[in-house]
């Protein structure tokens, strides 16, 4: 039996005792019963009255990342008297999980509700539930209040080392190396001069050539990076909270962070649910996180069709993120290779999400002739995996 049914039953039992005593004409019983029945009824009515007089507003956390615990601030905006055990809880849409409601005291005027951000996204909060006990502690009462608010949960990402040391480049010829796509490039080798700090001596080259050498490095010219995200829904494998598209978003955020940290700029390419392609360029990280938080896999365009709609910057390093590769990608990849800008094709491993036969071995062999290809799985150490992929692709 629910608490509400028990509370109503108690009121009706008291009411029936009062009526019965009145019918059989027992004045003293009528008086006692009416008095005892009026106490909880009065407590209930007063509690409801004061609860409906209370108005709260809510403040949602900013900069919250998927997998973190967040706090929603509930402030009492208006109130005459607070019933005991007053709490406020926002009606959170799934998959957000409320951990503990906010306890409110009129004197303090505010409380914190704890919740867990299970998945990235943009969540609109429309209601809060105010709960309390009556003044006698017999009944539990509650009501809903309309609110308007939006909360953004950013995607999670990893910070990996994007500065690359090409220790072997240019060593044999004792000359300069080719610029890398961001990071540090090998510049030159020269003999150590008297008066310089011994710390600058490269002992490996010294042992090889029999003389003291110094290796000079210079900051490589930063390159922009274009990240194309496949938003085709048929290419999403896994459940609502953990799937290949969510892995793509995490990889995109991580690559964007590394590129910006390395002095470049980032262009995000995707298609919306109407099949309209979008291309947005960024030089700071927070707007990228906000875009990725809002992105959904609802586009009718496959990745190959999206790429046909775009005129991409030839000077930008191109990264393609998908979990549904097919032969239709080969013409685009071949064209980019002929232009001297081989893309980086990152495949989200659908087999790690329970999908078998998601791509063929012959396709993988074909595509390797035109692009750097890497497969990223759910169980991979993403930081180490991206560091290795970045190093391989940057050295091409």
Language model regions located:
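Short coil/turn segments at secondary-structure boundaries
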Residues: 9, 33, 182, 201-205, ...
């Amino acid at each position: 039996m629910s608490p509400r049914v028990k509370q109503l039953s108690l009121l009706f039992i008291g009411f029936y005792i009062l009526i019965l005593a009145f019918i059989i004409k027992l004045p003293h019983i009528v008086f006692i019963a009416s008095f005892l029945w009026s106490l909880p009824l009065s407590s209930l009515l007063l509690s409801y009255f004061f609860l409906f007089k209370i108005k709260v507003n809510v403040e949602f956390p900013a900069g919250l990342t998927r997998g973190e615990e967040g706090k929603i601030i509930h402030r009492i905006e208006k109130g005459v008297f607070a019933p005991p055990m007053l709490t406020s809880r926002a009606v959170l849409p799934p998959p957000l999980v409320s951990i503990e409601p906010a306890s409110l005291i009129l004197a303090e005027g505010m409380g914190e509700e704890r919740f867990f951000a299970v998945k990235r996204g943009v969540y609109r909060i429309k209601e809060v539930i105010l709960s309390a006990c009556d003044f006698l502690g017999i009944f539990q009462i509650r009501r809903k209040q309309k609110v308007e608010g939006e909360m953004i949960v950013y995607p999670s990402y990893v910070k990996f080392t994007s500065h690359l040391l090409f220790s072997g480049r240019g060593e044999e010829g004792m000359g300069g190396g080719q610029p890398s796509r961001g990071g540090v490039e090998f510049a030159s080798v020269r003999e150590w001069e008297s008066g310089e700090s011994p710390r600058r001596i490269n002992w490996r080259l010294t042992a090889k050539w029999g003389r003291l050498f110094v290796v000079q490095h210079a900051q490589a010219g930063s390159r922009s990076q274009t990240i194309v995200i496949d938003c085709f829904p048929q290419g999403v494998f896994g459940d609502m909270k953990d799937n290949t598209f969510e892995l793509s978003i995490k990889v995109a955020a991580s690559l964007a962070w590394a590129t910006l940290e390395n002095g470049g700029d980032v262009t995000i390419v995707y298609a919306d649910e109407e099949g309209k392609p979008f291309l947005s360029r960024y030089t700071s990280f927070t707007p990228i996180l906000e875009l990725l938080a809002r992105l959904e896999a609802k586009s009718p365009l496959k990745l190959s069709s999206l790429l046909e709609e775009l005129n991409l910057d030839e000077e930008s390093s191109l990264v393609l993120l998908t979990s549904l590769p097919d032969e239709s990608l080969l013409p685009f990849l071949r064209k980019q290779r002929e232009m001297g800008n081989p893309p980086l094709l990152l495949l989200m491993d659908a087999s790690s999400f329970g999908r078998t036969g998601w791509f063929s071995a012959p396709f993988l062999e074909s595509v390797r002739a035109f692009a750097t290809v890497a497969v990223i799985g759910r169980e991979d150490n993403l930081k180490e995996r991206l560091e290795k992929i970045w190093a391989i692709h940057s050295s091409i």
